From Swiss-Prot:
It comes from Lycosa singoriensis (Wolf spider). The keyword Signal applies. The lineage of its organism: Eukaryota, Metazoa, Ecdysozoa, Arthropoda, Chelicerata. It comes from the Eukaryota. Residues 1-20 form the signal peptide. Belongs to the neurotoxin 19 (CSTX) family. 08 (U8-Lctx) subfamily. This is U8-lycotoxin-Ls1s.
Length: 77
């Protein structure tokens, strides 16, 4: 009985380790890629930065991109 419980715990630990490793190996989104639907998938040196789109004062959508952390982007006229 103890052997069955021990074997079950070992198998559970192995499966958990495999799942954690697969989570860490998922592909990250590179710079300037759209991250609207996946805000946590930008690569480690990037952050998912979102901007609202407006037309005549009414919000018509939202865009999110993987951008460098700490960088401020300004509109050029």
């Amino acid at each position: 009985m103890k052997l069955i419980i021990f074997t079950g715990l070992v198998l559970f630990a192995i499966v958990s380790l495999i799942e954690a490793q697969a989570e860490n190996e998922r592909a990250c989104l590179p710079q300037y890629q759209v991250c609207t639907d996946a805000p946590g998938n930008c690569c480690s040196n990037l952050v998912c930065d979102c901007y609202g789109r407006y037309k005549s004062g009414t919000r018509i959508g939202r865009n999110c991109f993987c951008l460098q952390k700490g960088v401020i982007y300004k509109r050029e006229n």
